[in-house]
Amino acid sequence: MSRVIKIQAVIDTVCPWCFIGKRRLDRAVDAFKAANSDVSFQVSYLPFELDSQRENQLNKEASYKKKFGEERFNAMLPSITKTAAGEGINLKFGGVISRTFDSHRLIWWSNQYGKQAELVEEICKLYFERNEDVADHEALANAAENVGLVKTQALEFIKSDQGISEVRDLLRQNAFRDINGVPYYIINDKYSVSGAQESDTLVKVFSQILSKE
């Protein structure tokens, strides 16, 4: 009998630790499935806005310096860049930072096609590796096309009002859960893991959860 581990990953698309966390989660899932052939995973992504009042197209580096302070940002940069590189991510801090709501809408939309994980990966790449604007509709539609979705359909969706109320509801639900930092993982609807945990740590968590189920 197959056992299922359901993971809801709460993320924001401009959070570097969410990108790092996704790579670690992917690796942990692959490793656990390889060692446990009777286990399958259902991974979905839920929205979180680190700053729901952010204006669009603010200078990315300047915004981080304003948030953390220039001295702290400069001290953090080598460490997080090195950590990201260890996960195969070429982290960059050029370009602009914008509100992430539309990127979350597109991720929500992609779920009906089974493309959420791939699209999250592609949107993170466009923002962190290519210095593109996460609120730019053309860039988001290109990301959708890159994972096998129809660009014109993605663009039509983003420019419409579809998914707005649904994503707002998901954001409210996460607020009710008292989630104040991401990434945050909800496992089998009753366990939670906070932060971009190492893959080995996540594998241990999966084992512990299955032993309780």
Residues of each region from the PLM?
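Structural alpha/beta surface segment adjacent to cysteine/selenocysteine redox centers
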Residues: 23-127
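A short SAM/SAH-binding and catalytic strip from SAM-dependent methyltransferases
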Residues: 16-17, 70
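C-terminal cap of thioredoxin/glutaredoxin-like
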Residues: 3-10, 14, 20-37, 41, ...
